[in-house]
Amino acid sequence: MVEKVPMTPGGFVKLQEELRWRQQEERPRIIEAIAEARAHGDLSENAEYHAAKEAQSHNEGRISELEDLTARAEVIDLTKMSGDKIKFGAKVKLVDEDTEEEKTYQIVGDQEADVKAGRISISSPIARALIGKEVGDSIEVNAPGGSKAYEILQVSWG
């Protein structure tokens, strides 16, 4: 059975845009670079040729990965999400019970995670601890820097 990959509509669009760019812009540019490097003669010591072939390999690998991800994507319509329990797509406001520092995170798919932008992967330790909880609940997260305790202040959607 094919495992679905949950993602937000915005995350899906970003993957589609990257796939289009790699197929329609980057692939032709690399093919042109290979042809140009090949024209320089001896390929055994041709650094430009080897660099272009390596770039081609990387690009084709990423294209395959993006095609797989978009085929398995389960786009979750966040506008239809509601309720008090935390699940995929929720924006969660937390307070660190030790430092009183407040943080807001949105739980997103693995491909969309960007901690600096406040988006955490659904498979991250903190998101796994949050799933199923509600406002007022406390969670404990075992992170590389040690154990942290948070209280859930707010859950919102969209």
UniProtKB/Swiss-Prot annotation:
InterPro entries registered for this protein in UniProt: GreA/GreB_C_sf, TF_GreA/GreB_CS, Tscrpt_elong_fac_GreA, Tscrpt_elong_fac_GreA/B, Tscrpt_elong_fac_GreA/B_C, Tscrpt_elong_fac_GreA/B_fam, Tscrpt_elong_fac_GreA/B_N, Tscrpt_elong_fac_GreA/B_N_sf
GO molecular function: DNA binding; RNA polymerase binding
Pfam families: GreA_GreB, GreA_GreB_N
GO terms of biological process kind: DNA-templated transcription elongation; regulation of DNA-templated transcription elongation
Keywords: DNA-binding, Transcription, Transcription regulation
NCBIfam families registered for this protein in UniProt: greA (TIGR01462), PRK00226.1-2 (NF001261), PRK00226.1-4 (NF001263), PRK00226.1-5 (NF001264)
Function of the protein: Necessary for efficient RNA polymerase transcription elongation past template-encoded arresting sites. The arresting sites in DNA have the property of trapping a certain fraction of elongating RNA polymerases that pass through, resulting in locked ternary complexes. Cleavage of the nascent transcript by cleavage factors such as GreA or GreB allows the resumption of elongation from the new 3'terminus. GreA releases sequences of 2 to 3 nucleotides.
Family per record: Belongs to the GreA/GreB family.
Protein name: Transcription elongation factor GreA
Organism: Rhizobium leguminosarum bv. trifolii (strain WSM2304)
Gene: greA
